[in-house]
């Protein structure tokens, strides 16, 4: 029986009170470290974002600057929109495939992230239904994650964003998808 048990030598840390999304993030990190190399393009620890292009919805100027700087350091570029309506318009104006993913805040003026995601998913263009949309929000309860997924977002990340977790999500939803195509 002991031979059949996968021993997880790595641990994660959660503070109290903790949210389901934070628990899920820690479990995913532990699993990724325990399973190691899976034959996919790169591992979580050395994911390269070099050359990736992101469209990001972020109404907080400081958060937008931090996100842009993080992505720039990783070799990626980012176009910032201040609300959901601007993201929708910028995506409509873009060439198909211009962006590798959309990083979507949820609480924004003019149009929220849920409505923007629903609108993007209904556009009559080939990439509208398949571009990864990653929720990046302070809304960290299980019902917030459920609402993000039902709006058409691929995954929900709670703020403050952990760079390692963001890279893992990008690996899973952007790099592996591109590798498979």
Predicted regions: what they are:
Residues 1-181:
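C-terminal compact regulatory domains
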């Amino acid at each position: 029986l002991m031979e059949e048990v996968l021993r997880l030598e790595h641990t994660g840390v959660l503070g109290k009170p903790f949210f389901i999304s934070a628990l899920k993030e820690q479990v995913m990190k532990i699993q990724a470290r325990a399973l190691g190399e899976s034959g996919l393009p790169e591992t979580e620890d050395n994911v390269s974002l070099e050359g990736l292009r992101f469209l990001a919805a972020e109404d907080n100027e400081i958060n937008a600057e931090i996100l842009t700087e993080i992505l720039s350091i990783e070799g990626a570029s980012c176009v910032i929109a201040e609300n959901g309506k601007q993201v929708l318009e910028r995506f409509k104006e873009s060439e198909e495939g211009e962006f590798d993913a959309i990083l979507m805040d949820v609480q924004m003026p003019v149009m929220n992230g849920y409505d923007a995601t629903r609108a993007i998913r209904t556009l009559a263009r080939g990439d509208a239904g398949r571009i990864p949309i990653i929720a990046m929000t302070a809304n960290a309860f299980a019902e917030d994650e459920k609402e993000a997924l039902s709006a058409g977002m691929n995954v929900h990340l709670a703020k403050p964003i952990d760079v390692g977790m963001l890279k893992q999500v990008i690996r899973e939803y952007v790099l592996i998808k591109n590798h498979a195509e």
